Amino acid sequence: MVRKEVPVSNRTLQWKCVESKADSKRLYYGRFVLSPLMKGQADTIGTAMRRSLLGEIEGTCITCAKSERVPHEYSTIVGIEESVHEILMNLKEIIVRSDLYGTRDAFICVRGPKYVTAQDIISPPSVKIVDTTQHIASITEPINFCIGLEIERNRGYRTRTTNQDASYPIDAVSMPVRNANYSIQCYGNENEKQEILFLEIWTNGSLTPKEALYEASRNLIDLFIPFLHAEERDLHLDDDQNIFTAPFFPFHEGLAYIGIGESKKRIALKRIFIDQLELSPRTYNCLKRSNIHTLLDLLSKSQEDLRKIQHFRVEDVKRVLDILKKRFAMNLFT
């Protein structure tokens, strides 16, 4: 455990990690302080950070298991104590760390009698098992136990789909932050009250609380970047006076208006993230798994490239093209 004194400054806004500990391989704790803040600012920041920590942080987990020997999910295998369903639930609990998007293949192939743990998972170098002692199955007889696994990086909770080709999808929970809380302490006199924000973060070990804080902060910054380049010309209301219509402008014209030259347009494109394009969750996840994170990444692909993305439908391609045309006056090569 690491403890530090909390400095209270009346001048420069500062943050510190005042407590950091690992209760186990699957439970990390961090306590952070931000001060000095004006009255009301601590609650604003605390609320936004907590929502970002719990809902926006991406994680990696096992999403599917494959075995041709298994007739259905609720069957049992001779020589193994656990049912297939129990094995799937154990795989769901395995904590995995990976910074890469897309599907990664892994497998388990052992011979009993054996106590199978996460250590027996053979995975690519880009995937790390956080706790190799996590239990998967108990083999009581001299039989072979071989299953294939799919590992994906995503965020939030995703329900499984119907199994195909001897595959058994797992309800994926890509939420590395287990909990996040904040508290506020006020100080100073009535005329000049200031606040200290205390932020507590618990993670599952796939990333540290400090890493989670960094990622949550970056996600919030990405959400607010469009407001820094807001187009304010010719704003108008329709006849209804209740419906606000933002003016349309070609993307390159908008870049010129905010003072961005040709040489810097790539930087501007890189600062527009695909989560700002109002895509459906399904389309967004497919693009993210293909390492398409920004508008620049998207424009580097052709329509044919999008059609080749796993689970990406023709209507998804049409939706992306429609957004690019209406919002940016752009298109993709066929």
Swiss-Prot record:
<dbReference type="InterPro" id="IPR036643">
    <property type="entry name" value="RNApol_insert_sf"/>
</dbReference>
<comment type="similarity">
    <text>Belongs to the RNA polymerase alpha chain family.</text>
</comment>
<keyword id="KW-0808">Transferase</keyword>
<dbReference type="Pfam" id="PF01193">
    <property type="entry name" value="RNA_pol_L"/>
</dbReference>
<dbReference type="GO" id="GO:0000428">
    <property type="term" value="C:DNA-directed RNA polymerase complex"/>
</dbReference>
<comment type="function">
    <text>DNA-dependent RNA polymerase catalyzes the transcription of DNA into RNA using the four ribonucleoside triphosphates as substrates.</text>
</comment>
<keyword id="KW-0548">Nucleotidyltransferase</keyword>
<dbReference type="GO" id="GO:0003677">
    <property type="term" value="F:DNA binding"/>
</dbReference>
<dbReference type="GO" id="GO:0009507">
    <property type="term" value="C:chloroplast"/>
</dbReference>
<dbReference type="GO" id="GO:0003899">
    <property type="term" value="F:DNA-directed RNA polymerase activity"/>
</dbReference>
<dbReference type="Pfam" id="PF01000">
    <property type="entry name" value="RNA_pol_A_bac"/>
</dbReference>
<dbReference type="InterPro" id="IPR011263">
    <property type="entry name" value="DNA-dir_RNA_pol_RpoA/D/Rpb3"/>
</dbReference>
<comment type="subunit">
    <text>In plastids the minimal PEP RNA polymerase catalytic core is composed of four subunits: alpha, beta, beta', and beta''. When a (nuclear-encoded) sigma factor is associated with the core the holoenzyme is formed, which can initiate transcription.</text>
</comment>
<keyword id="KW-0934">Plastid</keyword>
<keyword id="KW-0804">Transcription</keyword>
<dbReference type="GO" id="GO:0006351">
    <property type="term" value="P:DNA-templated transcription"/>
</dbReference>
<feature type="region of interest" description="Alpha C-terminal domain (alpha-CTD)">
    <location>
        <begin position="264"/>
        <end position="334"/>
    </location>
</feature>
<feature type="region of interest" description="Alpha N-terminal domain (alpha-NTD)">
    <location>
        <begin position="1"/>
        <end position="231"/>
    </location>
</feature>
<dbReference type="GO" id="GO:0005739">
    <property type="term" value="C:mitochondrion"/>
</dbReference>
<keyword id="KW-0150">Chloroplast</keyword>
<dbReference type="GO" id="GO:0046983">
    <property type="term" value="F:protein dimerization activity"/>
</dbReference>
<keyword id="KW-0240">DNA-directed RNA polymerase</keyword>
<dbReference type="InterPro" id="IPR036603">
    <property type="entry name" value="RBP11-like"/>
</dbReference>
<dbReference type="InterPro" id="IPR011262">
    <property type="entry name" value="DNA-dir_RNA_pol_insert"/>
</dbReference>
<dbReference type="InterPro" id="IPR011260">
    <property type="entry name" value="RNAP_asu_C"/>
</dbReference>
<dbReference type="Pfam" id="PF03118">
    <property type="entry name" value="RNA_pol_A_CTD"/>
</dbReference>
<protein>
    <recommendedName>
        <fullName>DNA-directed RNA polymerase subunit alpha</fullName>
        <ecNumber>2.7.7.6</ecNumber>
    </recommendedName>
</protein>
<dbReference type="InterPro" id="IPR011773">
    <property type="entry name" value="DNA-dir_RpoA"/>
</dbReference>
